[in-house]
């Protein structure tokens, strides 16, 4: 009887251990899968021609999902820590907010005007939107999901970038051929002349970089002493970004990317893209350059270490993504 009781206790303990082990294994695989899914680097491509966003896994280089948003999506910015994607819809005068964990549309923010380019501050509390038609920059609270400020700026504000070092909003005024710089309190710090028809802009450290569409050039502006110099690129440059001390410029006529070494001040490579390349962004995990091709409804992907063309992926109609569009 005692022996049987001991066996029963042993069997019970064994069963409990087995159940706990099984439960822990399930938890392990669940959370491993969860973190794996949420650590995937993705590109969010706004397709202005069919009112969608193509979501692309940058590890497998495959489209994960095509999401319907507002009419004529163009500008974009991503809050990396909050995992939120803000998409500007020109045709419906609003912003679509996407949850980047589940890739679902969670909010539509009415603006009452057409959004062009988007950027966000480093604290991820504010999203800035250029209002081309009314010459404003709108500030959206990322927490309240509503417009909290309309700042009057120069004529036809086009591109906008956020400088983390100085907490500046850096804005191109296309038809005025100027760059305007505002601090975190929306005070004008400086207005400076650029080349002809400035559009895309990028800013980090002590510099701002501006693509001058009609001059086939890029202006580099020192944010400390306000000196500047220019270098020539391909025909009709649309946007510029810097990665590892190298400037990359989209040339919409000629279908190329100019790769410019900022140290030697020389062009080191010309990359062939799809038709009418407009915007670009970088994936840090796989060292990828991703370029949106408005004319061929696609993205071109390159390795930034050897400038090797990896793949062209068909997306939606008129792919643009004016802003930061890669979730790292």
Whereabouts are the PLM-identified features?
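Predominantly soluble domains enriched in secretory-pathway, periplasmic, or organellar proteins
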Residues: 2-4, 8-328
């Amino acid at each position: 009887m005692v022996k049987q009781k001991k066996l029963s206790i042993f069997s019970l303990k064994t069963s409990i251990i087995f159940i706990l082990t099984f439960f822990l294994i399930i938890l392990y695989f669940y959370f491993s899968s969860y973190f794996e899914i949420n650590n995937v680097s993705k590109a969010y491509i706004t397709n202005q021609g069919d009112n969608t966003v193509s979501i692309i896994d940058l590890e497998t280089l495959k489209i994960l999902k095509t999401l319907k948003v507002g009419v004529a999506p163009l500008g974009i910015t991503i809050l990396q820590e909050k995992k939120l994607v803000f998409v500007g819809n020109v045709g419906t005068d609003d912003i679509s907010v996407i949850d980047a964990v589940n890739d679902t549309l969670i909010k539509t923010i009415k603006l009452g005007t057409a959004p062009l380019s988007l950027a966000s501050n480093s604290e991820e509390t504010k999203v800035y939107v250029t209002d081309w038609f009314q010459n404003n920059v709108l500030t959206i609270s990322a927490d309240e999901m509503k417009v909290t400020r309309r700042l009057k700026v120069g004529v036809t504000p086009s591109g906008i970038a956020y400088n983390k070092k100085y907490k500046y909003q850096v804005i191109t005024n296309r038809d005025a051929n100027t760059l305007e710089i505002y601090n975190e309190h929306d005070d004008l710090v400086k207005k400076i002349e650029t080349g002809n028809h400035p559009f895309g802009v990028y800013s980090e450290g002590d510099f701002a970089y501006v693509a001058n569409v009609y001059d086939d050039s890029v202006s580099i502006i020192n944010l400390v002493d306000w000196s500047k110099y220019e270098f020539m690129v391909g025909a009709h440059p649309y946007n510029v970004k810097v990665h590892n001390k190298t400037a990359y410029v989209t040339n919409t006529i000629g279908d190329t990317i100019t790769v410019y070494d900022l140290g030697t001040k020389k062009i080191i490579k010309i990359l062939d893209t799809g038709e009418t390349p407009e915007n670009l962004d970088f994936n840090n995990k796989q060292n990828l350059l991703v370029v949106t091709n408005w004319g061929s409804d696609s993205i071109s992907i390159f390795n930034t270490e050897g400038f090797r063309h990896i793949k062209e992926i068909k997306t939606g109609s008129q792919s643009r993504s004016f802003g930061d569009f890669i979730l790292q």
